C-alpha cells in the first residue's frame, strides 16, 4: 500500500479562494478598533437570545400538544410524538447547559481580583 504525498496548494488557487474574503473584510490599520455598530451588536445578541428561548418554548409547547394528543388518541403516529418530545428535551437540555456555562463564566469573572 503506497501513501501519496500531500500536494501543496497552488498559489493561484489560494489567492482565488482568499479574494472574496478580503473583499468582504478589508484590513484597516493595526491594533484593536471599536466597531462602529458596537451598540447594535449588543442589541443583536439580546435579540438572538430572545429568539432562541422562544424556539425552545415553541418546541416545548409542540411536545405538550403531541403528548396530549397521544394520550387522548387524537394522534395515531407514535414516532411523531416521540420525536417532538425528544426535540423539546434536547433543546431544553442545551439551553440549561448554555445557562450553566454563562453562570460559571460570570462567577469566574466575579472571583477575579483587580
UniProtKB/Swiss-Prot annotation:
The keyword Ribosomal protein does not apply. Pfam families: FliE. Its main location: other. The keyword Transcription does not apply. One of its GO terms (cellular component) is bacterial-type flagellum basal body. Keywords: Bacterial flagellum. Belongs to the FliE family. This is Flagellar hook-basal body complex protein FliE.
